[in-house]
């Protein structure tokens, strides 16, 4: 029995994930689907530009933990993405890897490895403080 090439399995999984799983099972909105597609496309662009991987050579090893961590650094340094954007892109890739591992057990290692990658720290936003003087002016304007 002839087994399907890894690049074909991954390409089919990306297609099913984006056209069936996300819109029908997860019921994501059009904008969310667009974001997920862009996120996956950015990872594939990274593989092509930084690792020399093509659509015919993509394989499970392309989802190694160290490559994903390099990608996160690349997003931050080269693309100038904020920590929030980097975390969103990482969650998209993790979502795909979980889907891929459920479809083909041979990819479960990459799902487990990706799950260990920590999110970037995001700066906490300072709460805006309303001064007593401002509150007095607000109440004074009501009268």
Q: Where do the PLM segments sit?
A:
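A detector for short, charged/polar N-terminal pre-domain segments
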Residues: 7-13
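Basic, Lys/Arg- and aromatic-enriched nucleic-acid-binding interface segment
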Residues: 137-143
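N-terminal core-binding DNA-recognition domain of tyrosine recombinases/integrases
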Residues: 2-4, 15-31, 37-125, 141
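Catalytic-site neighborhood detector that most strongly recognizes the C-terminal catalytic loop/helix
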Residues: 129
């Amino acid at each position: 029995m002839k087994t399907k090439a890894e690049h074909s399995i991954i390409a089919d999984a990306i297609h099913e994930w984006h056209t069936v799983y996300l819109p029908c099972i997860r019921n994501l909105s059009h904008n969310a689907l667009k974001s997920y597609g862009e996120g996956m496309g950015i990872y594939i662009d990274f593989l092509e530009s930084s690792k020399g991987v093509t659509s015919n050579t993509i394989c499970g090893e392309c989802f190694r933990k160290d490559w994903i961590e390099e990608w996160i650094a690349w997003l931050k340094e080269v693309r100038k993405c904020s920590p929030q954007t980097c975390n969103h892109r990482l969650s998209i890739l993790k979502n795909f890897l979980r889907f891929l591992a459920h479809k083909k057990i041979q990819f479960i290692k990459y799902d487990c490895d990706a799950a260990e990658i920590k999110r970037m720290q995001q700066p906490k936003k300072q709460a805006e403080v309303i001064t007593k003087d401002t509150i007095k002016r607000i109440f004074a304007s009501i009268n």
